[in-house]
């Protein structure tokens, strides 16, 4: 596939024939009506097929262990949240703040790539899923999901799986990518795009533990 070859040649940190570069990271125009431009690589990656770093939702640096005891915004467990809590029964000492979307200071894309990049919203993942075709494929020996826009341009999301504690045993079998949106009804969870290659399952899931380590694929808006 020609576009796949162009995507891989572009890399992630320099402009050599891709659709564009912002703050040193390449993006692809998939022809989406929102004008959203998707990064060619995961945050922490140098090539489209690299897994990159894993982040808990609302954290901006990778770590070795992902669970509630290491999560920044709780006091040790899922029902002791200290930020992004819409239900008092999930908050530490009944805490709520009604925050439902990542603040800029808690966005891994902004923290690592600078302003102009950010973690996609729920609606932007929906747009990608419904306005682009998607299929499982393998690039340079790495399995993942290829999204192709109506203009013929493509992005590849590697099957980096997710991390709970330090376990990533499903690497190469599934992918897990954060949105910037909280699960408002169950605030210990956040919204993410997930795919399971063997099941041909590609969908948006609301019930992802915020403390889990997911990939982040950044977006850039041109206007």
Where are these regions (language model features)?
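Bacterial signal peptide processing site
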Residues: 13-15
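C-terminal motif of bacterial Sec signal peptides marking the signal peptidase cleavage site
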Residues: 8-11
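Sec-dependent N-terminal signal peptides
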Residues: 1-6
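Conserved positions within compact, well-structured domain cores
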Residues: 17-223
């Amino acid at each position: 596939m020609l576009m796949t070859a162009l995507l891989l040649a572009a890399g992630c940190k320099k402009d050599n024939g891709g659709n564009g570069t912002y703050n040193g990271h390449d993006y692809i125009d998939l022809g989406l009506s929102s004008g959203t431009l998707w990064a060619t690589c995961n945050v922490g990656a140098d090539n489209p097929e690299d897994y990159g770093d894993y982040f808990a939702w609302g954290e901006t640096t990778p770590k070795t262990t992902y669970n509630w005891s290491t999560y920044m915004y709780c006091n040790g467990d899922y029902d002791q949240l200290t930020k992004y809590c819409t239900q008092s029964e999930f908050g530490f000492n009944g805490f709520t703040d009604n925050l439902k979307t990542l603040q800029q200071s808690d966005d891994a894309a902004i923290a690592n790539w600078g302003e102009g990049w950010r973690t996609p919203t729920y609606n932007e993942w929906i747009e990608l899923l419904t306005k682009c075709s998607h299929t499982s494929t393998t690039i340079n020996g790495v399995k993942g999901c290829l999204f192709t826009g109506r203009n013929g341009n493509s992005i590849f999301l590697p099957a980096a799986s997710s991390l709970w504690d330090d376990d990533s045993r499903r690497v190469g079998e599934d992918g897990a990518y954060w949105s910037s949106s909280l699960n408002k009804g169950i605030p210990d969870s956040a919204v993410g795009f997930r795919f399971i290659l063997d099941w041909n399952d590609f969908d948006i899931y609301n019930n992802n533990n915020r403390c889990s380590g997911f990939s982040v694929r950044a977006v850039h808006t041109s206007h």
